[in-house]
Amino acid sequence: MDSDPRFAAAAGGAVRFLAEAAGMPEDVCKEFQEATVRASTKAFDAQPRQPHTVEFLVFGDRLEVAIDADVGSHAIRLSRSVVPQR
């Protein structure tokens, strides 16, 4: 992804969709979305001229997001446990 705030918002929307589909509570979905947008924006601001890779990883017990500019720095990783609604 290019360092565009619209891509940060899109990454947040994708995480929210995955979190809702996994049955996570609404407040957790919203927080994960906001955290993803913040992390994406932070990564974009740190390396504005570099393309970024955003990975969405779905496991049975958690969802993860990794944002990486692939310039030797460590990726920003976010993870939330899947807590199904009852």
What are these regions (language model features)?
Residues M1-P25:
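Helix-loop-beta hinge of the Bergerat
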Residues P5-F7, K30, P84:
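A generic structural micro-environment signature
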Residues F7-A9, F32, E64:
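Residues in flexible loops and secondary-structure boundaries
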Residues G12, P25-E31, I67-A69:
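Residue-level signal for functionally critical sites in structured catalytic/ligand-binding pockets
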Residues A22-D27, L78-S81:
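Glycine-rich loops and low-complexity Gly/Arg-rich segments
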Residues E26-P51:
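Conserved ATP-binding N-box helix of the HATPase_c
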Residues K42-R86:
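Conserved beta-strand-loop-beta-strand hairpin that lines the nucleotide-binding pocket
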